Regions:
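Intrinsically disordered, low-complexity proline/glycine-rich segments
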Residues: 1-125
Length: 125
């Protein structure tokens, strides 16, 4: 499906999108994009959105849609996004992988968020 994923939407591992776009919303929830942080319940780490739909762009970043991959400590391809709404869609079903430089920044941010969670001993969910 090409339904757009938003902040707070869940994932196939029981996780959720932690934060998203600062400029675009749908039904008062920010749109998720490549590189945005995602909590993974299975590996207990913060990962990031590793794919986006090139037909829906927000601030020069591809927006994530249902089924796009999350990168975390889980095996590649086992952690996917689940859209919670069925109205806002990208123009077509498509996926591009996050560029290396963007992935490096997202990975660094995810590690910082995981470390902060471990130091605070507070669950993210």
């Amino acid at each position: 499906m090409t339904y757009v994923v938003r902040e707070g939407d869940s994932t196939t591992t029981g996780g959720m999108v932690l934060s998203a776009s600062g400029s675009q919303t749908w039904e008062d929830r920010r749109l998720a994009r490549m590189g945005d942080p995602v909590w993974c319940e299975r590996c207990a780490q913060v990962g990031f959105i590793g794919q986006g739909n090139p037909t829906f762009i927000d601030d020069l970043v591809a927006v994530a849609t249902d089924g796009h991959a999350v990168r975390c400590a889980c095996a590649e391809g086992t952690h996917r996004l689940i859209a919670s709404q069925d109205q806002l869609q990208a123009d077509m079903e498509a996926a591009i992988d996050i560029p290396k430089d963007m992935a490096d920044k997202a990975r660094k941010r995810a590690r910082q968020m995981t470390r902060a969670r471990l130091e605070s001993h507070e669950p993210l969910t």
